[in-house]
């Protein structure tokens, strides 16, 4: 049994500037007000004044460990995460977290947060296989939770960093966007917003099978790059989203300076040509989706004899549905993969809807005026 009062008294005298905080901790502990004490400790461990040295480790060993069984499991893990940051040996930290996981097994959220922290440590020491296994294990548990919880953001932060480390652009893009969907962008420093926006943009362009840029384009994190030396990335993303091959080629002087993009120029060109075909299909009225080979070739900046190959590729990966008429050199599209739209694309839909409403109104007036003839 540790002498908690003695530890708290000693802490009060050793840090006069924080004496009131230590006194408050002692008061709540003595009165056994566990909920209020938990909240006070949560505030305490987040105070930058106590982030240095091993003060939080001593706090845990001499104080928190005496009543941790009375603390809400998720809150306990939140506290523990601050404690392990002061452990210089990652193996010691891992052992500590494993023991904590056993203590909080009554709460799925607490276990998930604990395992996520373990995965982050594994990633930091370069144990990629263990990190992968942890992510797979936690993701299965996460899918069983109702709604979005406070642990979702930490998991997606871990998984996106893992995918970034192994160079899986598509998975990074997906989970990094999920992370942003779980946090308030205002809580992230501008420098972090800019870095996340930049890596997300690159991952979207380079990611295999990523054809949906609307969610990123509509997210405020991208605005952190506006009017900076990385503005070109926003422009390039908009070019891809609208399938504007001309614009993409015009911007080459900017994106061509980025090594990863320059090294994958041919892949990027193929992707934007597919997006061009999608956009051509999307902007046509549903009853007028006959595209000629010449129209496709002109927009996608390819020769006519390569159009069929482009369309077949789009059909094979499920971006569009339709049929090719080789004799008349036409493509009849019946469906295009749904995407998150940017404001310009939404405006285009609005214009087409208004045109449709006008046509319906005209038909209504026609029937009204000629009703007698029709009835007789």
From Swiss-Prot:
Keywords: Acetylation, Proteasome. GO terms for cellular component: cytosol; nucleus; proteasome accessory complex; proteasome complex; proteasome regulatory particle; proteasome regulatory particle, lid subcomplex. It comes from the Eukaryota. PANTHER family: 26S PROTEASOME NON-ATPASE REGULATORY SUBUNIT 13 (PTHR10539:SF0). Component of the 26S proteasome, a multiprotein complex involved in the ATP-dependent degradation of ubiquitinated proteins. This complex plays a key role in the maintenance of protein homeostasis by removing misfolded or damaged proteins, which could impair cellular functions, and by removing proteins whose functions are no longer required. Therefore, the proteasome participates in numerous cellular processes, including cell cycle progression, apoptosis, or DNA damage repair. This is 26S proteasome non-ATPase regulatory subunit 13. SMART domains: PINT. Belongs to the proteasome subunit S11 family. Transmembrane segments: none annotated. GO terms for biological process: meiosis I; ubiquitin-dependent protein catabolic process. It comes from Rattus norvegicus (Rat). Component of the 19S proteasome regulatory particle complex. The 26S proteasome consists of a 20S core particle (CP) and two 19S regulatory subunits (RP). The regulatory particle is made of a lid composed of 9 subunits including PSMD13, a base containing 6 ATPases and few additional components. The modification N6-acetyllysine is found at residue 298. GO terms for molecular function: structural molecule activity.
């Amino acid at each position: 049994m540790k002498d908690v009062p003695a530890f708290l008294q000693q802490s009060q005298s050793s840090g006069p500037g924080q004496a009131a905080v230590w006194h408050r901790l002692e008061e709540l502990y003595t009165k056994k007000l566990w909920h209020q004490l938990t909240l006070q400790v949560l505030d305490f461990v987040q105070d930058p004044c106590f982030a240095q040295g091993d003060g939080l480790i001593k706090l845990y060993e001499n104080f928190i460990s005496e009543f941790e069984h009375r603390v809400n499991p998720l809150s306990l893990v939140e506290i523990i995460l601050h404690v392990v940051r002061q452990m210089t040996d990652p193996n010691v930290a891992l052992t500590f977290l494993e023991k904590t996981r056993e203590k909080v097994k009554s709460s799925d959220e607490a276990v998930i947060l604990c395992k996520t922290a373990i995965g982050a440590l594994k990633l930091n020491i370069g144990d990629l296989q263990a990190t992968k296994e942890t992510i797979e294990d936690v993701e299965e548990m996460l899918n069983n939770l109702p709604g979005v919880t406070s642990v979702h953001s930490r998991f997606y932060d871990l998984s996106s960093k893992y995918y970034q480390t192994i160079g899986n652009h598509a998975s990074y893009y997906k989970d990094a966007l999920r992370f942003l969907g779980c946090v308030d962008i205002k809580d992230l420093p501008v420098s972090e917003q800019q870095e996340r926006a930049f890596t997300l943009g690159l991952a979207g362009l380079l990611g295999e099978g990523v054809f949906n840029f609307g969610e990123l384009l509509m997210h405020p994190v991208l605005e952190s790059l506006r009017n900076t030396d990385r503005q070109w990335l926003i422009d390039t993303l908009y070019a891809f989203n609208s399938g504007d091959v001309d614009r993409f080629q015009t911007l080459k002087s900017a994106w061509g300076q980025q090594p990863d993009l320059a090294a994958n120029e041919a892949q990027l060109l193929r992707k934007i040509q597919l997006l061009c075909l999608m956009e051509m299909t999307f902007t046509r009225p549903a009853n007028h989706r006959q595209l000629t080979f010449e129209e496709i070739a002109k927009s996608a900046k390819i020769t006519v004899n390569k159009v069929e190959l482009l369309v077949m590729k789009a059909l094979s990966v499920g971006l569009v549905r339709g049929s090719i008429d080789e004799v008349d050199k036409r493509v009849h599209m019946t469906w295009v993969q749904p995407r998150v739209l940017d404001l310009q694309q939404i405006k285009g839909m609005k214009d087409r809807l208004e045109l449709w409403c006008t046509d319906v109104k005209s038909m209504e007036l026609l029937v009204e005026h000629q009703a007698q003839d029709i009835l007789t």
